[in-house]
């Protein structure tokens, strides 16, 4: 009896230990989410729903298109191309040599205001056939150098405009080197129209991308000179022409803000523009234009958005009417088994 009891005790202890071991399994924890068993709604695109969807889209998009188009048409815009007219007739056979010469390049232009323009009137320069999105051009800069004076020697990404005589260029790179340098001054009836150049750049760029203690060094001291110069006594965060230029454009035709005229211009006014035709667009067959423009709640003049809304809305409305006519003329019962392939006649046989 004692041996039996002992063996029973040992056996009992063993089974207790085995039952205490936690069983492991590679089976993932059950969840209705992971097993895709959550309740779901699966809408069926019935003819009525399709017609209603297209109808609603057309009714919404067409008025939006009309509103956007009216807003765009309300913008008054004057565009004056001057790159060819500002070259003397005797130099038009070799415009590159003229623009690279040392002579004075003052040009006088006259602009007539055809429709009243309420202030502020935005002054833009427009360049065409200028690829600021070229990979080599875009990479030729150092954003860290623009923010901190500690990074002024980090110019390895700025070649070929990285240093002059071993000294770093600040700001370095082709983007800064090619800074636009045509200048404009305006007058009306012999009275000067002041151009406000404060606040023409993005506030986020001024505060975050250009340092308040970073000053130009050795800029445009090499050869050849690419574009405009900078004031060495002003930090980069205050040189807004540079900040505007450094925000590169995605397309070869682009506008950049030059300044704002804080005076109303009346219909029939004659604006005299004295400009310095300095920037070389002739080497790459580019164009230069001066643009005066007002704005609307939608921005500058751009008919594309309104036309796009009208086009899409008209297509949706046309499809809604077409489907409605087809549904009324030749209705089809939803889920009709006679339309199944095995229920259709093949070659006239059932």
UniProtKB/Swiss-Prot annotation:
The chain crosses the membrane at residues 50-70, 304-324. Expressed in roots, leaves, stems, flowers and siliques. The modification N-acetylserine is found at residue 2. Keywords: Acetylation, Endoplasmic reticulum, Glycoprotein, Golgi apparatus, Membrane, Transmembrane, Transmembrane helix. The keyword Membrane applies. The keyword rRNA processing does not apply. Residues 1-23 are annotated as: Disordered. It is a multi-pass membrane protein. It is found in: Golgi apparatus membrane; Prevacuolar compartment membrane; Endoplasmic reticulum membrane. Disulfide bonds: none annotated. One of its GO terms (cellular component) is endoplasmic reticulum membrane. It comes from the Eukaryota. Glycans are attached at residues 181, 231. Belongs to the CDC50/LEM3 family. Required for the lipid transport activity of the ALA/ALIS P4-ATPase complex. Interacts with ALA2 and ALA3 in a heterologous system. This is ALA-interacting subunit 5. It comes from Arabidopsis thaliana. The gene is ALIS5.
């Amino acid at each position: 009896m004692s041996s039996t009891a002992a063996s029973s005790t040992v056996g009992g202890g063993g089974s207790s230990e085995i039952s205490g071991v936690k069983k492991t399994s590679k089976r993932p924890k059950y969840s209705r989410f992971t097993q895709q068993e959550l309740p779901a709604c699966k809408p069926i695109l019935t003819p009525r729903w399709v017609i209603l969807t297209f109808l609603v889209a057309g009714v919404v998009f067409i008025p939006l298109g009309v509103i956007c188009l009216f807003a765009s048409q309300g913008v008054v815009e004057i565009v004056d191309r001057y790159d060819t007219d500002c070259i003397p007739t005797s130099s038009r056979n070799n415009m590159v040599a003229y623009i690279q010469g040392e002579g004075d390049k003052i040009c006088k232009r006259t602009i007539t205001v055809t429709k009243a323009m309420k202030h502020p009137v935005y002054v833009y320069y427009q360049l065409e056939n200028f690829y600021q999105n070229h990979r080599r051009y875009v990479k030729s800069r150092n954003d860290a150098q623009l923010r901190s004076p500690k990074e002024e020697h980090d110019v390895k990404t700025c070649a070929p405009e990285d240093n002059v005589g071993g000294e770093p260029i600040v700001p370095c790179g082709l983007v800064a080197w090619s800074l636009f340098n045509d200048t404009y001054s305006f007058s009306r009836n012999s009275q000067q129209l002041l151009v406000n150049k404060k606040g023409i750049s993005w506030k986020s760029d001024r505060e975050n991308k250009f340092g308040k203690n970073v000053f130009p060094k050795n800029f445009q001291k090499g050869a050849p000179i690419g574009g405009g110069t900078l004031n060495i006594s002003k930090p980069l965060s205050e040189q807004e022409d540079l900040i505007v230029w450094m925000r590169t454009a995605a397309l070869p035709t682009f506008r950049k803000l030059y300044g704002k005229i804080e005076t109303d211009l009346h219909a029939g006014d004659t604006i005299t523009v004295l400009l310095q035709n300095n920037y070389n667009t002739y080497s790459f067959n580019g164009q230069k234009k001066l643009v005066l423009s007002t704005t609307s709640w939608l921005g500058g003049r751009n008919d594309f958005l309104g036309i796009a809304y009208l086009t899409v809305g008209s297509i949706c409305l046309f499809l809604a009417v077409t489907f409605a006519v087809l549904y009324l003329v030749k209705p089809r019962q939803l889920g009709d088994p006679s339309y199944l392939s095995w229920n259709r006649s093949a070659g006239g046989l059932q």
